[in-house]
Amino acid sequence: MLFRSGFYGADEYGKICLFPRGGSDTTGALAAFCIDADAYENWTDVDGVFHSDPQLDPKQTPINRLTYDEAQRILDAGAAVLHPDCLYWARKKGTPIIVRNTFRPHLPGTRIGP
């Protein structure tokens, strides 16, 4: 198991720089890519990926499984649960992304991938 802080890195000159919003998501996906991880778990404050904002419609339930393409469409439509760049790195090696809730770790979340 690898734990790594996110949202920062170094530029081509070695200068430390901060990533934009969602940078921690991308950092995690890239780290999973680099170490050939079996999966990348993205822990957040919602129960997984939803078809729409769960705060606007609290009766909906998270989606159990999504393909990369299905997740891409949801993220392109404005879902902010995961940075879209994560899908690029996960798709390159077929690494599943599992979106889970930090405050409700007993829930399975949403599995994205092949």
For each of these PLM feature ranges, what is it?
Residues 1-114:
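C-terminal catalytic "cap/lid" subdomain
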